[in-house]
Regions:
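Conserved beta-strand-loop-alpha-helix junction that forms the acyl-donor binding cleft
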Residues: 105, 131-141
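C-terminal "cap" of GNAT-fold acetyltransferases
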Residues: 92, 157-194
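Conserved GNAT acetyl-CoA-binding A-motif
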Residues: 121-133
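A short beta-loop-alpha structural element at the N-terminal edge
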Residues: 14-26
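Conserved GNAT-fold acetyl-CoA-binding loop/helix
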Residues: 27-55
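Conserved catalytic-core motifs of GNAT/GCN5-like acyltransferases
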Residues: 80-83, 130-133, 145, 150-167, ...
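Acetyl-CoA-dependent GNAT
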Residues: 44-103, 114-115, 174-175
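Conserved acetyl-CoA-binding loop-helix of GNAT-fold acetyltransferases
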Residues: 106-119, 142-146
């Protein structure tokens, strides 16, 4: 996947598959979110080696990791999706994450990244994409609504960061209109009996 656009402040911005050399830039964006936001509900920062392993694991499991880079190759944003839950019944559902470097927010990179991930999930034949968002993150909620996501649940006080409880909003986007055929129902029932 390679998609290019131009931005006056950053020059040409390319959306492409991440490579190991992008790991330091991804780690920097991740760590900024750990330190300064509730976009990530982790307290521990990571290094480039951790992110390189993460990229490799996502790829090994068949999931994309995308980056938006400027003309110098600096990582401006990244995104991925992976399993929503690790049970067979959820195999058609994925959960995504998108993070944009602080000085690059408001340039449309989050929208481009999320749209590219939605496209990739459709190509993979996924059925639903889930977003798990801090319920006070109104810009992220608005972006997801603009791309067709709908609110599907709220878990109050599900997380804790910066000395306060955080509410978790789930949003979902149905990626296709497939129904359920009788053979699938019978096969699932047969597996459940064994």
């Amino acid at each position: 996947m390679i998609e290019e656009s131009s931005n006056a402040s950053a020059g040409p911005v390319v959306l492409r598959d991440a490579v190991p050399a992008d790991a330091p830039g991804i780690a920097s964006i991740y760590n900024d979110a750990v330190r300064h936001s509730t976009a990530i509900w982790n307290d521990v920062e990571v290094d480039a080696g951790n992110r390189a392993e993460w990229i490799a694991a996502r790829r090994r499991d068949g999931f994309p990791v995308l980056v938006a880079v400027d003309g110098d190759g600096a990582v401006l944003a990244y995104g991925s999706f992976g399993p929503w839950r690790n049970f067979d019944g959820y195999r058609h559902t994925v959960e995504h994450s998108v993070y944009v470097r602080g000085d690059c927010r408001g340039m449309g990179l989050g929208r481009r990244m999320l749209a590219a991930l939605v496209d990739a999930a459709r190509v993979q034949g996924r059925h639903v994409m889930v977003a798990a968002i801090d319920a006070s993150n109104t810009p992220s909620i608005a972006l997801h609504r603009q791309l067709g996501f709908e609110e599907s649940g709220l878990v109050r006080e599900a997380g804790f960061k910066f000395g306060r409880w955080l509410d978790l909003l789930f949003m979902r986007l149905q990626l296709d209109e497939r129904g359920v055929d009788e053979r699938s129902v019978q096969a699932s029932a047969a597996r459940a009996l064994h």
